[in-house]
């Protein structure tokens, strides 16, 4: 079993032969509220993924117009290049939803950031493109309240890692 604050609290209470304290139970309820917000945010982002990805790609093209005029496999000067750009932005968004469901940065760290520098150098991709895409998604996802805060925390984490 993986260790989390909840499993550690249960293990400590069990080793001491006691029930969970009211403080430990409050922490558990807080984690469940956070999880509910994360799940709601992941669902909303997934439901709006196409429009968010397309809008984010257009934001990248607007800020970095050379991406649509430079020929080559790694640029958006062709329909295939634009499709690759959208695919990559969609991958970043998908990983954010995984983090929201998992309740931690593990999916971002393991599935995206590990080895990302090597991939970007190999394929001549600029992290600033994805930072711009993530900023667009953050500004336009339409979430509010705790769901917004949960989503933004992972988007910000990823932006900071790319910056």
UniProtKB/Swiss-Prot annotation:
Chief subcellular location: membrane
Subunit structure: Heterodimer of an alpha and a beta subunit, which further assembles into trimers and the trimers into hexamers.
Function description: Light-harvesting photosynthetic bile pigment-protein from the phycobiliprotein complex (phycobilisome, PBS). Phycocyanin is the major phycobiliprotein in the PBS rod.
Claim: Electron transport is one of the keywords in the record: yes
Annotated source species: Synechococcus elongatus (strain ATCC 33912 / PCC 7942 / FACHB-805) (Anacystis nidulans R2)
Lineage, uppermost ranks: Bacteria, Bacillati, Cyanobacteriota, Cyanophyceae, Synechococcales
Family affiliation: Belongs to the phycobiliprotein family.
One protein family per Pfam: Phycobilisome
Gene assigned in the entry: cpcA1
PTM summary: Contains one covalently linked phycocyanobilin chromophore.
Sites where the protein binds (2R,3E)-phycocyanobilin: 85
Designated name of the protein: C-phycocyanin alpha subunit
Subcellular location: Cellular thylakoid membrane
Membrane topology listed for this record: Peripheral membrane protein
Residue runs in coiled coils: none
InterPro entries: Globin-like_sf (IPR009050), Phycobilisome_asu/bsu (IPR012128), Phycobilisome_asu/bsu_sf (IPR038719), Phycocyanin_a (IPR006246)
Record flagged with keyword Thylakoid: yes
């Amino acid at each position: 079993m993986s260790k989390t604050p909840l499993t550690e609290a249960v293990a400590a209470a069990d080793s001491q032969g006691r029930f969970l304290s009211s403080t430990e139970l409050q922490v558990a309820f807080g984690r469940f509220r956070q999880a509910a917000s994360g799940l709601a945010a992941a669902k909303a982002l997934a439901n709006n993924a196409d429009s968010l990805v397309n809008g984010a790609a257009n934001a990248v093209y607007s800020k970095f117009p050379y991406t649509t005029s430079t020929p080559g496999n790694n640029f958006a000067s062709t329909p295939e290049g634009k499709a690759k750009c959208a695919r990559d932005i969609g991958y970043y968004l998908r990983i954010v939803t995984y983090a929201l469901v998992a309740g931690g940065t593990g999916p971002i760290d393991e599935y995206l950031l590990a080895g990302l520098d090597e991939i970007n150098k190999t394929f001549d991709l600029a992290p600033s493109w994805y930072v711009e895409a993530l900023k667009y998604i953050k500004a336009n996802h339409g979430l509010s309240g705790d769901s917004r805060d949960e989503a933004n925390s992972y988007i910000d984490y990823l932006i900071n890692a790319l910056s």
